[in-house]
Amino acid sequence: MVVRKRMNRFLLIFLVCLSAVCSLYSQGDYENGDIYLYGETHGVVRILEKEIDIYSGYYQEDHMRHLFIEYPYFISYYLNEWIQSPSDEILDSLYEQWKGSASYNPAVKEFFEEIKKHCPQTVFHGIDVGHFYWSIGEQLREDLEENGMSETEEYSKVIKSIEQGEVYYETGDSLFREQMMVENFIEEFESLEGESVMGIFGSMHVTNKDPEEKNRYGNLATGLIQTYGDRVHTESLTSLAANLLEDPMRVDTITIDGIEYEASFFGRQYLKNILPRFIYRDFYRIENAYDDFSNKKKNSNVLPYNNYPVQVQTKDVFMIEFCLADGSLERQFYRSDGNTWNDMPVTEQFLL
């Protein structure tokens, strides 16, 4: 089990890393190699398919081999082991450990499988802070120690990624996360000695590319442009998600008031930059449930149809699961009675 470090250690790590990032931002000219960043809405099939198409083009036509991803170093280490393996055992293990995250989505797993199938010489570079440091990160640390690799560069990167994850999950500091992503990206990119790369990240990390117009936290693209200038190219793919989903990403079974229901999952929306109290919300449509909940007392909360990633019909019932800033989960239930608010069709929250 990982023992949580004292806050003074977190502060020390933060200051050291921040100093390193500031130094990297101000470095001089670099030669060769462009950076192509694509912003996504996580887990959307149309976007994942487009990303495969774009990367395959770079891979086949431009001989690009390096794909930067929104995962920590230790996950990309395992992905690189997996892509060279004849089996999918490593990916299967990672996928099971991604439960509870946006990566636990069959479309995401299929994305990696397609990369392995069509672009088998790909090298993944994970540059995010240490998400899953308590499980996957510690697992790799132990694996390397058992194999006598505790003095290697790989081991140092694993420890660094774990420590970044500890700081981020202790403080919730999004500025720290963005700055670490910039530092980690630059470190990996510079090690390639002039090769061009593609990166896939959530749109909030990519779309704000003007250093003079920083968003609330700054972001990855801003930091990279400060270092590499017009060698950084950004494009948002989020418009591909504008069309509402027709089919669920998966179907779960949940129990409400002692009764089991099928719950169709329609995706996750990240809220931290919009509503600081929340990290994200997950949308579930509870199938064939309206009659069971139509008489439940409503409160005054409404949620317009345009908040949902799927077409809403009268007599639909939804469960929205919020992840709060402290990591706790809160479930809210809404139903569509065909009512409007300010001339907008809305769902209304009801109480269990």
Where are these regions (language model features)?
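N-terminal secretory signal peptides that target proteins for export/translocation
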Residues: 1-7
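Bacterial N-terminal signal peptides
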Residues: 12-21
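Compositional signal for N-terminal targeting/processing segments
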Residues: 24-352
